[in-house]
């Protein structure tokens, strides 16, 4: 071999080695980037899911103790909870997502001082809206009687509703504070506090009902004690100096620009309410099918399974919202796309796992709620539809979270309205009463609505110009931003700026 050939061969080997090293570096960089994104996602999603599951657990604790105290009380509590309280819970959850959008984008844009202002504005707006809807809770009994509900049950509702008013007002603070802390990656404390509040709720409820014999009032007292204990603990955390960059005290600026905040909050609340009420309407419709008792029992059990899984997925919704809002605030459209891909992949994989578990154990799980073999068979018959619903449920909330993070609540609300109520429910009615498919027909209609909603949201997000969304976010931050009067004199803020 000539010297020239040896040199060419050596150069080829060196080029190949360099290319291999470059590919290896790119692979390591990608793995590091994915792991970093997954870590950020779980830091948000895990405490958020825990908060939602413990909040739902508080409702279950009250229901369980009331059920052991009075069957009539259980029926009244379930009726009030599944109608007016569920509506307000969905409304507060939706309106608080406006706080999540604004605080997330402000945190990404490093406008930390505005986050506390947004939180205060959300308290004002949510308090006003809750007070506006309060007469519906006060008049829940008469309204339900006008709708033809059992008189004896609705009279018990009249005795229960005063206990629910403090609980509803506690939601204003717990939900908005959760979004505020979540936007700045401090929501681990929310998971801890929500777990402790559930434990306190359980202890107080047990003491009031089992030891003091307070019955329904004792169960609802425990619910309020647990809820407000969490609110007070969150106040201590925020006001006590654990959020030095984002909470600088109460400000008169909170009363400025309330109309834009109200518009965003209402569109957010409308978006979530449509989803919360969808399942409730289907449960009510199940009562008019053949073998209504079995149908309602089976559908309710499936609803419990669906709701537990939904609470986990809503944690991913929060993660998607915060990550998208943060990166939009930073002005990084590429990072937005990357975050969406990672969160969607993880959530879909979890959906596949949950769906498989549902298919394998759904019939057995039903025995946790009922000893009836007929109910178990009915639940097992619905397991395939439930599994598909769970799979779609692992995708749709992420897409909604992305839309919320970008401030597209109004668009999602319209999509939800069209998918659920213009397509899903009418189709379910046709399958039930025309084709006589019973509960399976109802759920199939719901499934069609969710599938259509998912497809539309996928298309909207796929076609979204994220560079344009970055510009819109920057413009929104300029319009809504407030210059901190003490920025130059505040060593904490100066230190935060240097670290960035």
UniProtKB/Swiss-Prot annotation:
- GO cellular component terms listed in the entry, alphabetical order: membrane
> Sorted alphabetically, which keywords does the UniProt record give?
Membrane, Transmembrane, Transmembrane helix, Transport
Q: Where are the transmembrane segments?
A: 48-67, 72-92, 124-144, 160-180, 188-208, 225-245, 266-286, 298-318, 342-362, 384-404, 411-431, 441-461
- A GO biological-process term: xenobiotic detoxification by transmembrane export across the plasma membrane
Q: Which InterPro entries match?
A: MATE_euk (IPR045069), MATE_fam (IPR002528)
Region Disordered, residue ranges: 1-20
Membrane protein topology class:
Multi-pass membrane protein
The GO molecular function terms of this record are: antiporter activity; xenobiotic transmembrane transporter activity
Tell me where in or outside the cell this protein is found: Membrane
* CDD domains, sorted: MATE_eukaryotic
Q: Which family does it belong to?
A: Belongs to the multi antimicrobial extrusion (MATE) (TC 2.A.66.1) family.
Q: What is this protein called?
A: Protein DETOXIFICATION 24
* Organism, scientific name: Arabidopsis thaliana (Mouse-ear cress)
* Name of the coding gene: DTX24
């Amino acid at each position: 071999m000539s010297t020239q050939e040896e040199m060419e061969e050596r150069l080829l080997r060196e080029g190949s080695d360099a290319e291999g090293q470059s590919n290896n570096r790119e692979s390591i960089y990608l793995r590091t980037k994915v792991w970093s994104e997954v870590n950020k996602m779980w830091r948000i999603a895990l405490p958020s899911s825990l908060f939602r599951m413990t909040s739902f657990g508080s409702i279950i604790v009250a229901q369980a103790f009331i059920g052991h105290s009075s069957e009539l009380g259980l029926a009244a509590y379930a009726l009030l909870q599944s109608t007016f309280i569920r509506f307000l819970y969905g409304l507060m959850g939706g309106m608080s997502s406006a706080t999540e959008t604004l605080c997330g984008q402000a945190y990404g844009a490093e406008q930390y001082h505005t986050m506390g202002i947004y939180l205060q504005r959300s308290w004002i707006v949510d308090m006003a809206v809750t007070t506006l809807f309060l007469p519906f809770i006060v008049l829940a009994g008469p309204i339900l009687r006008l709708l033809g509900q059992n008189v004896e049950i609705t009279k018990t509702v009249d005795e229960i509703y005063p206990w629910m008013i403090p609980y509803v007002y506690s939601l204003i603070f717990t939900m908005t504070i959760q979004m505020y802390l979540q936007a700045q990656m401090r929501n681990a404390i929310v998971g801890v506090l929500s777990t402790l509040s559930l434990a306190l709720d359980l202890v107080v409820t047990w003491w009031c009902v089992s030891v003091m014999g307070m019955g329904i009032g004792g169960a609802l007292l425990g619910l309020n004690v647990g809820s407000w204990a969490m609110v007070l603990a969150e106040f201590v955390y925020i006001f006590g100096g654990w959020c030095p960059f984002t909470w600088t005290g109460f400000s008169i600026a909170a009363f400025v620009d309330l109309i834009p905040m109200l518009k965003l909050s209402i569109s957010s609340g409308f978006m979530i309410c449509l989803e919360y009420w969808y399942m409730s309407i289907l449960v009510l419709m199940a009562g008019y099918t053949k073998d209504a008792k079995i149908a309602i029992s089976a559908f309710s059990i499936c609803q419990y399974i669906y709701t537990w899984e939904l609470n986990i997925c809503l944690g991913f919704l929060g993660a998607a919202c915060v990550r998208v809002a943060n990166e939009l605030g930073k002005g990084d459209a590429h990072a937005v796309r990357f975050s969406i891909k990672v969160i969607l992949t993880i959530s879909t994989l979890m959906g596949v796992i949950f769906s498989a578990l549902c298919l394998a154990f759904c019939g057995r799980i039903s025995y946790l709620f009922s000893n009836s073999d007929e109910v178990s068979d009915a639940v097992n018959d619905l397991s395939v539809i439930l599994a598909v619903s769970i799979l779609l449920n692992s995708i749709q909330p992420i897409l909604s979270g992305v839309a919320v993070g970008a401030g597209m609540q109004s668009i999602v609300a319209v999509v939800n309205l069209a998918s659920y109520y213009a397509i899903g429910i009418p189709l379910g009615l046709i399958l039930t009463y025309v084709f006589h498919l019973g509960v399976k027909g109802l759920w199939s209609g719901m499934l069609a609505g969710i599938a259509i909603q998912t497809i539309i949201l996928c298309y909207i997000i796929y076609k979204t110009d994220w560079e344009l969304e970055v510009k819109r976010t920057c413009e929104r931050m300029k319009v809504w931003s407030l210059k901190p009067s003490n920025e130059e004199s505040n060593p904490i803020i100066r230190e935060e700026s240097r670290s960035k």
